[in-house]
């Protein structure tokens, strides 16, 4: 019933919201925009001239506008200029301009004078602050360009843009186009910066930045590149510039299309709700995802910066050059950029093994996709709230995983040719999913349309079971059954069939692929030998080995071992396999040399310890953790040497967290606290690739004195984003109830940026010792949280964090709370959080009795 009720509500919203799309009566071809921001007054003045084409004669034109105060408006057509009356529709964020005499079909020009606010909600044209200075910056995606200038704020309405900014003397201006001129005036104490006309692009890609910026310059194959920051962080921009230079070259070559927007500016912003934003020619970033300390940064931080930058630069082709027609195809933007991001990084730094990160990221999608409330990749959306919700693991990581799977089957060269042809065909235009897979099918000659459509239009994760029937002539006949994986284990409840390739690999490294397109079918694979059912971990499906296996001989590579761990985890999570099978597998991988595998085990075993192990069985479980993983850490050594290889530090860090949190290892906890104390005095005393974990595990037994030292340290780190967030994120790890409450209250302080409040609370909801207190705090402080964050930034993350609760009573509490405090931008998120909580309670009930018996024997 709940599923039906939710669907009914969602359909009602969508139907009621159809009017929020603009009427198809006019379309813009060019905007000339002039802005005069008042940083001290947190307002701006604007003037714009919009060239439009009218589809038919009309007396009115409707466009988007929100939080805009209109001044005089005129419309000129066929040589006649008329003053327009403005009628606002605040609910739908539209303005209708009406003139006395009908405008003829064809060309017309609108001129608008208006004012707006530089808001504090990190959307549209907004205010950011740092070092006593103010900055005016933008974040337009998805539907907030209308807060900066009246416009056709839908992706299908592409136009060119001329931008001018009149700003305070001494400030810098950045926009999408290259700077053409910078002249004094015309007002006292001001100067006007004029930018080159852009190619045709959607409104959500417009960028405006004003303030005291310092930039580092370079170029790549004729494209000027700058990485810009507040002046105090300029020394942290070198790594991003180096990465961008390589990535532009890589993408020029891969796509066979030269970078399409002339120049590229990359700007770090102190207050920024997204991770980064692909504005054409002017990419904006959250500072911690762009700046790298050349003297002291972890490989993980550098890899993250390079990967996020690669994602945004890929968007200059996927999303900016070719843009989806409507937001239901956002996967054409985000999924493709996610798929591409690792390619450029892998070519530049093969030693980073980013294919492991890509495989690990797929789990974010699977975590969402195993829910019965999961959405298909392509989902009908209408309102800004619904649009906001589809920027999720399904759009990003699931799409990327699907593309990797199909690419592996078709072959990288053929797939690349199809991509290049698609981008060339739709350059500076809009495209749909049908446009993409039709072109890919035409170029490759492979049934990509059948595969992609099957995977894009259905929710859920396929799970395959295998039964080897016979071996004839060195070829195995394998009966393969596909069904939709469900956390409740009932795979017959939602019968579905996908069309996708499954690739099997034997121990000699040879793979054979078959298209799976029926509920049950027999496939042939050579030779007759044990095989791993997801070669190189490239398939977007789960493998249910029957009988269940707890050995790793079938998985030959790191990626395959990671895939095996996660496959077996989901079998245990749904009670399809006894949970002790996963524990046996974990024991077999304790000495694995891949940090990501140990980190995955740490996360999965942490779930078991905090949600499935009975309180009375905690000592036995902790002892098993210590007995299994303690010798591994002892062999690696703790604290180890700061100069140890990154992989060694990564394994040590994962084991330290596992033993400290799930194993209750008193010696590890003591050493971690000593290391944290030493790190405060001398950061060089701890390896940079395990510093975050040292501070976190050190906090577990930390007292008021250590907490105060963490807080004091934060105040000194304004110019070191990576180090700042090491300490900031560690605050939630203090188990002392009084210190936990202090951290929760700190989240609402003015000194904590609004972009960080939601992240802190979401992270604390993930910690078993903090989740109940954090949920109580969220309920008690809901008005203050929504006032600080708004409903588009921060709140969705908090809602997703609630899925870490684990009792039916908590599920009922969450449902009741959001029935009274509805958040339209997180409707699906609330439903998914409730389902996650209920599924956690279910697996606890199903697995805990057998686990208790197993622990008593181990």
Outline where the language-model segments fall:
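Ligand-binding face of N-terminal immunoglobulin V-set domains in extracellular IgSF glycoproteins
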Residues: 45-65
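Hydrophobic helix-coil surface modules that form long, contiguous segments used
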Residues: 46, 137-143, 150-310, 339-342, ...
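Solvent-exposed beta-hairpin/edge-strand motifs
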Residues: 58-82, 497-499, 503-505
